[in-house]
Amino acid sequence: MNQNQISSYINQANEELEAATLLLEKNYYRACISRCYYAIYCTVQALLIVKNINTRSHRGVRQQFSQHFIQTGELPLELSKALRITYDLRQLGDYDQVIEITREQTQIA
């Protein structure tokens, strides 16, 4: 387990969450969702490193998180759902310029 990597991911997660809060206050919903996703992503990466699991893709992070934390019952299913929903919203916000992202969707993230 690399404590420096874990600390780095946790620090980045906190920074992303703080940025998301500021973006929500300014009604920048697309950017807010993206920052929310990365806050969760960094937190999950830190958890995976604790178990000496390294991944190189977003999909791998979601799969490994589910396998090692959700399916084992160590963490509740709702966390996996939150990761998936936030990932899906980020994909829409980042890559589908036609769709409108609402405050309600942002608050789900």
Predicted regions and their residues:
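Terminal alpha-helical segments
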Residues: 1-109
